[in-house]
Amino acid sequence: MASRAEPARVVILLATYDGAAFLADQLASLEAQDHPDWRLVWRDDGSSDESAAIVQDFANRQAQGRVERLAVPEGHVGSAAGFLALLRYVALGLGPGDVVAFADQDDVWLPFKLSRAVQALAALPREAPAIYSARQVLVDARLNMLSVSPRLSVPPRFPASLTQNLATGCTVTMNQAAARLVAGSKAPPGCQHDWWAYLLVTAAGGRFLADEEPVVLYRQHGRNAVGAPRSFVRRGWAALRRGPGVFMGVLRQNVAALDAQRHLLTPEARMQLEQIQRALRGGPMRRMAALRLPGLRRQTWAEQMVFRLWFMIG
């Protein structure tokens, strides 16, 4: 068993899909990490470009066993399903002090990315699930700085995690307990892997660590699976334009997925979930009562006003 004095082993999960244009930068940033004890497990999602060849060439230059390819499931399954397949593959082999980090194919990690996550998670009890996320430097396709992702104004917790995702996948790192929790669960169809991890860990009483130091150059370009709005005000405006249908559909789906796995949740989370379910089945009075639940809110007043409107009418 690993001791606290030993550096944590990091298992990096990488899902590739037609990412040849940017992969070399990301792989080089893994080699530049000041936390040296990592291994990479990757899966290609049916790329039509040289993505798989680029990662394989990288693997050939590493020590034997440091890079491993997962061949299943075959074909194109999408980003979320690909990452969850990788997580399930590695979860049982994790040691007590090991951590898992998601890596997007088109970003660049700053050299201290892993070490900050490892240090933050090491300060918490190993037996409790914990998930780490950090701010990002938003850059264009050529790595020119655009802005820095906003600070979180409200502590991330459940049930706020039902209303929006605050765990940006390219920064997410989980301890063994969180990784096994998520790997053993069933995510709702279409839910991004990072949001599901954040949602489930917080509903299960785990810790969410939000690092205010940016640790990733997060590329914004036309082929991102999911981009990052530069401010929470823009997120609120984007939600307003989409209307209540999409948002409330996602909310109901996530509520149903948690309800189907109630045994994983804390008693408090189960009670909160039941109140939200009653509100979604009921009329205005029940919905107004649910909106008074502590923590059922989004990050800013603009986002919160949109959320309240959609919750009442959607």
Q: For the regions a protein language model found, what residue spans apply to each?
A:
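Nucleotide-sugar donor-binding/catalytic module of glycosyltransferases
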Residues: 2-230, 314
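C-terminal subregions of glycosyltransferases and related glycan-biosynthesis enzymes
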Residues: 190, 195-196, 217-314
